[in-house]
Every structure is written in C-alpha cells, then in structure tokens.
From Swiss-Prot:
GO terms for biological process: proton motive force-driven plasma membrane ATP synthesis. It is a peripheral membrane protein. GO terms for cellular component: plasma membrane; proton-transporting ATP synthase complex. It holds the Pfam family ATP-synt. F-type ATPases have 2 components, CF(1) - the catalytic core - and CF(0) - the membrane proton channel. CF(1) has five subunits: alpha(3), beta(3), gamma(1), delta(1), epsilon(1). CF(0) has three main subunits: a, b and c. The keyword Ion transport applies. Produces ATP from ADP in the presence of a proton gradient across the membrane. The gamma chain is believed to be important in regulating ATPase activity and the flow of protons through the CF(0) complex. This is ATP synthase gamma chain. Belongs to the ATPase gamma chain family. It comes from Chromohalobacter salexigens (strain ATCC BAA-138 / DSM 3043 / CIP 106854 / NCIMB 13768 / 1H11). It comes from the Bacteria. GO terms for molecular function: ATP binding; proton-transporting ATP synthase activity, rotational mechanism. Keywords: ATP synthesis, Cell inner membrane, Cell membrane, CF(1), Hydrogen ion transport, Ion transport, Membrane, Transport.
Length: 292
C-alpha cells in the first residue's frame, strides 16, 4: 500500500494547487472587467485628441510640426509595453517576438534601434537579451496613471526632438476579445499621413467646424502633439493590462482543467493500485490457510 499512499499524497497536492488556480482565475476575471472599463474610458480621449491635432494641422498648413514630417530613417525607437507579473500564457513572449522581428528588419537596413521598456518583464527581457535600453518603468500597478509614464515617454520625445530618433513606435498587446490578444506595432511619430486622412474624413462627416486658438495654433499644436503621444502610450498600457488579465484568466482556467484531468488519471491509478494490494492480501490469506 506504500505506492497507493504516495499517489494519494500526490492527489491531495494537486487538489490544493487546483484550488489556488481556480481562485486566481476568478480574481483575474474580476480584474479583467475593471481593466476593460479603464481601457474603454481612455479610448474617447485618445481618439479625440488625434482628431483635434489633425484638424489644427490641416487648418494651418503654413506650420508643419517636426512630429509630422518624415525623415530619413537612421535610428528608430520602440516603447515596449509588457506586464509586471507572469502566469499570463504567451502574452509577453508574443510582444518580445514582435519587437525582435522589427529590430531584425531595421538592423538589416543599417538602422539603429533604441528601446524604452514599460513593465518589469520588458525590462528583464532587454537586460538579459541585449538591446539599447534608454528608459524603463515598472511597478505601475493595476490602475496606471499618465504621470507614471511621462518619464519614459519624455526620454524618447527628447531624442526625437534632438534628431537622435527618426521614428517612434509603441508595441503592446491588442485586446481583440477575452480569448484573443495579439501583439501590435503602432507608429507614433511622425504622425502617419493615412491616420491624418482618416481623421480629416471623420471631421468632414461630422460637419464643417473650426476652433478659436489661444494663444495661437502653433503653440497649441506644440503642446497637443506631446499630449497625443502620451495619450497613445497610456492607451497602450491600459489595453495591455486588460490583455494581461484576460490571458491570466485563460491560463488559470487551463491549469485548473488540467489539474482536474490529472486528478482523474491519478485516482484511476490509485484505485488500481489499491485493488492490486487487496487482491495480494487475499491471495496471501488464502495461501496461508491452504498451507495449514
């Protein structure tokens, strides 16, 4: 019966683990709903500020901000968004694979790449695998604020302002639905012409309108473009947070289900071992009685 006892101990351990993963699944589901609410709440601001920036730029063609001018690409920057914690399936790995593909492409073109990492997993990745990490931020918590991101964003914007970067991208997970999250690479700077055209089309569809600018359009555009980049990075962070909780919920559900299957298999093995032990005891008793 020694083998049966060991199996029973294993079953008990797996059941305890199953309780933990089941609890983590429920916690992740609750956190995912809150993260989705934050993601949804941030979308109108990010969408509207882009629309306003595009409108001001179109209404004042005499002033072309450097954030809207294409340059010869010699160096690019990536703001890479990850989670602070693991147990989220392949969520972070998929982002890192996307960044690695991008970096490989640019290196083949003779272009240098700088990185700003948001989230402890991204910071650890670049420390372990190399890459010119110029800024990093982790420990944002479950409800990040724009102020928490300004430092890392400012480093990349300063490099762009000084001509050290010619393009700036943000890489994060896109929330498709609860079951699906996919890595996405978005160009932040220069502001893409296609995006400007889309925003202009949306403006025309909503009617003809204009603003009164104080103190002037140039000053306003200078400030709004910085806010635009910050809002896009913040949107990426809160969307990635929703993806993290969804991925963790699915991962913990799979772990709970797998634990259940393993328990079923072990209980079958346990019952067979117990049956074999009982059969052996009966055989020994019968054999002893026959000898007498």
């Amino acid at each position: 019966m020694a083998a049966a006892k060991e199996i029973r101990t294993q079953i008990g351990s797996i059941k305890n683990t199953q309780k933990i993963t089941s609890a983590m699944e429920m916690v992740a589901a609750s956190k995912m709903r809150k993260a989705q609410e934050r993601m949804t709440a941030s979308q109108p601001y990010a969408r509207l500020i882009r629309r306003v920036v595009s409108h001001i730029a179109k209404a004042n063609p005499e002033y072309r901000h450097e954030y809207m001018i294409e340059r010869e690409v010699k160096r690019v920057g990536y703001i890479v968004v990850s989670s602070d914690r693991g147990l989220a399936g392949g969520l972070n790995i998929n982002v890192f694979k996307a960044v690695t593909r991008e970096a490989k492409y640019w290196h083949e073109q003779g272009v240098e790449v700088d990185y700003a990492a948001i989230g402890s997993k991204a910071n650890v990745f670049f420390r372990n695998h190399g890459g010119n990490l110029v800024a990093g931020k982790s420990g944002l918590g479950e409800a990040p604020a724009v102020d928490d991101l300004i430092g890392s964003v400012s480093v990349m914007l300063k490099a762009f302002d000084e001509g050290q970067l010619d393009r700036l991208y943000v890489v994060h997970n896109e929330f498709v639905n609860t079951m699906t999250q996919k890595p996405i690479v978005r160009q932040l700077l220069p502001l893409e012409a296609e995006a400007e055209a889309d925003d202009e089309e949306e403006t025309r569809a909503s009617g003809s309108w204009d603003y009164l600018y104080e103190p002037d359009a140039k000053t306003l555009l200078d400030h709004l473009l910085v806010r635009y980049v910050e809002s896009q990075v913040y949107q990426a962070v809160v969307e990635n947070a929703a993806c993290e909780q969804a991925a963790r919920m699915i991962a913990m559900k799979n772990a709970t289900d797998n634990a259940g299957n393993l328990i079923d298999d072990l209980e079958l093995v346990y019952n067979k071992a117990r049956q074999a032990a009982i059969t052996q005891e009966i055989s020994e008793i019968v054999g002893g009685a026959a000898a007498v």
